[in-house]
């Protein structure tokens, strides 16, 4: 239903737009798909978002810039509409508390997960993309404890990522009625699974899935 691309070269691509192949690749991808394309990595200012939208992105993902300056969430949403702004949150459990990390999960912040979600929502984000650092790539299931932890504070569309290894992991995730979507990568890279077969499985479980 949606493709998310996160560029780990970050702000480097914005230094010389003409020489960086990322934008040409992005434009080519956008011309050959019929689903929304969400792109992130290194966004710091309004012009960065404009560049991505002009090269085929439908929505953008921000992370570190929001943690550095939460007011930028509001600034970006005011300019391009909140439906365009997805805030990704990288989380790790430390001393029995879910803590937010930055710089692709390498640096600990002072934010607890629920506190940060409240700020993100108050600043006008349109969507949250939630990732578990420990569960990423595990194929052992989503971090259901983390998802349950935010059940009383989340009021935005929520995409949950990290850990899916089989279809039952998706079924269990969607038992949380506030989860809007499930994101995954490794299950398609390292198994014989396909998106179509996943959707067919979820349909048999009476879940509302677009096939």
Where in this protein do the model-derived segments appear?
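Glycine-rich, proline-tolerant flexible connector loops at the mouths of alpha/beta enzymes
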Residues: 2-22, 64, 129-140
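Conserved, mostly hydrophobic/aromatic
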Residues: 3, 39, 52, 87, ...
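Hydrophobic faces of well-ordered beta-strands that scaffold small-molecule active sites
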Residues: 3-5, 37-41, 60-62, 85-89, ...
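Glycine/small-residue-rich loop that forms an oxyanion/phosphate-binding "nest" at active or ligand-binding sites
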Residues: 9, 18-80
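Charged helix-capping and loop-helix junction motifs
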Residues: 17-27, 109-114, 140-148
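Catalytic cores of alpha/beta
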Residues: 33-56, 145-182
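Glycine-rich phosphate-binding active-site loops on the catalytic face of alpha/beta enzymes
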Residues: 51-72, 132-137, 162-169, 176-197
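Conserved anion-binding
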Residues: 57-130, 134-135, 206
């Amino acid at each position: 239903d949606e493709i998310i691309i996160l560029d780990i070269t970050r702000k480097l691509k914005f230094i010389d737009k003409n020489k960086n192949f990322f934008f040409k690749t992005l434009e080519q991808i956008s011309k050959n798909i019929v689903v929304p394309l969400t792109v992130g990595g290194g966004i710091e200012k309004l012009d960065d978002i404009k560049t991505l939208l002009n090269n085929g992105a439908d929505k953008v993902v921000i992370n570190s810039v929001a943690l550095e300056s939460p007011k930028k969430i509001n600034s970006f949403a005011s300019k391009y509409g909140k439906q365009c702004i997805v805030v990704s949150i990288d989380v790790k459990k430390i001393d029995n508390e879910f803590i937010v990390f930055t710089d692709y999960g390498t640096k600990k912040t002072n934010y607890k997960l629920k506190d940060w979600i409240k700020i993100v929502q108050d600043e006008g984000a349109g969507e949250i993309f939630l990732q578990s650092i420990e569960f990423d790539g595990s194929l052992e299931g989503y971090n259901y404890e983390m998802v349950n932890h935010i059940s009383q504070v989340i009021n935005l569309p929520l995409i949950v990522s990290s850990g899916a290894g089989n279809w039952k992991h998706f079924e269990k995730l969607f038992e949380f009625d506030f989860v809007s979507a499930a994101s995954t990568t490794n299950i398609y890279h390292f198994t014989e699974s396909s998106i179509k077969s996943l959707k067919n499985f979820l349909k048999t479980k009476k879940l509302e899935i677009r096939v």
